[in-house]
Amino acid sequence: MWKITWIQLMNRWRSNVWVCVELLLAFCLAWYMVDYFFVEIYNRSLPSGRGYANVWQVEMGLLPETSPDYRAAESDSIAMLGNYERIKDRLRDYPGVQAMGAASGCYSTPYTGCYYGIGLANAADTSKREAVMRYEIDPTTDFLSVFNHSYAKDGRPVSTSDFDWGDPRAIVTTRMVERKVFGEASAVGREVKDPFDEEGPTYIVKGVLEDIKRFDNSLPQGAAFLAIRPSAEEIPEMNYFIRIDPAVAGPRFADTFREKMSRELRVGNFYLKRLTSYERIKADTDYSFGITYDYRVRMALMAFLGLNI
């Protein structure tokens, strides 16, 4: 009898242990997913430091030498520089364009996932440093206004023309750089340099902006904006951005722009390659970097857990 009683107790104990293990696993899984979504919601609630509403990217292509429309005379340095200025002017003058910006390369294109970092340190004390995102922008355009950047001090909207880009050592940074490198002191007018490049230049901070997010679900980061005056060889790598008046930002905008500007932007050997809204760019980046996929996986796990509990 004692043996039978003992066996029954052990069987019940094993059954209870398995129930406890299952509940513990379910709790851990639920906690993991709830924590993930809590962090996502928190990160997305933070200011992004810039905006993408009504912003479009204009990509220009360059005819190959094998094209029947290619003109060799348009590829020399003087012609390239002149054509670059004409492209910018025609984008600025398009009806409904409120601001136009140009920046160099993929890494200077917001929300594409491309990344190019730079270290910044107090030139007088390089132990105080911060690694930040690097953007190279054409100061004759209004890149900062296109993406609605704002001052760290009072939140006012920023224009690229607010700063003295005539100084070849000019740099504009963000609040995180100021705080990490200079503490409570203002960074404006102070010298910074890349601590990892001993032979590199020393920059002078011309302004401090709000920190920006690389992605919507990431924390705000520091950034540095430097001027680029592209050479003829660098011009084909430039990207162009326009922010349009909400009044013309209807579904017909893209079709109308392509129809008219395909002719207007046929400058030298350049042609209009692609016009993409930032809504589309952000959606594509979220998908390609797994953000959309992560959501789907965790939502599926949540549904599976809910059905089985």
Model-inferred region functions:
Residues 34-126, 130:
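Membrane-proximal extracellular/periplasmic loop immediately following the first transmembrane helix
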Residues 258-296:
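A cross-kingdom feature of multi-pass membrane systems that activates on extracytoplasmic/periplasmic
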Residues 129-223:
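Hydrophobic secondary-structure segments that place a key small or acidic residue at a functional site
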Residues 1-12, 87:
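A short amphipathic helical element positioned immediately N-terminal to and/or at the very start
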